[in-house]
Amino acid sequence: KIAKYELFGHAVSENGASVEEPMNISIIVTDQNDHKPKFTQDVFRGSVLEGVLPGTSVMQVTATDEDDAINTYNGVVAYSILSQEPKDPHDLMFTVHRSTGAISVISSGLDRERVPEYTLTIQATDMDGDGSSTTATAIVEILDA
């Protein structure tokens, strides 16, 4: 919980006389990656019109990590999609921005009559994608155009 200690020290001889000027000593505590990312919700819900073009934004997912994200990568969260159900008409209909968690359409062919809803399993991984991870669900409703 304490990131830095500031000490004030000086050297003295055996008889107590100063032999050096007083100096500040800083001790910086390095964060240990001891927390997993946590999504702000277990289930995220969003919607998008059928037939939209690739690149259309759908929603955003958010995860936080209690570890230090300023001096280390321990608290830097990277997002990815682990799975999409159903895999129709393509197994990759959506993408998630690695650093922001913004989910957008990546393929054409969204059709409400064919597939009214998609379920995505989203993963958040700390250490900028190389550490501990956790998952949440994103449900995308396809709206009639």
Swiss-Prot record:
PROSITE patterns: CADHERIN_1, CADHERIN_2. The keyword Repeat applies. Residues 1-145 are extracellular. Residues 1-39, 40-145 form the Cadherin domain. It is a single-pass type I membrane protein. One of its GO terms (molecular function) is calcium ion binding. GO terms for cellular component: plasma membrane. It is found in: Cell membrane. It holds the Pfam family Cadherin. Keywords: Calcium, Cell adhesion, Cell membrane, Glycoprotein, Membrane, Metal-binding, Repeat, Transmembrane. Glycans are attached at N24. Interacts with CDCP1 and CTNNB1. Three calcium ions are usually bound at the interface of each cadherin domain and rigidify the connections, imparting a strong curvature to the full-length ectodomain. This is Cadherin-3. It comes from Sus scrofa (Pig). The lineage of its organism: Eukaryota, Metazoa, Chordata, Craniata, Vertebrata.
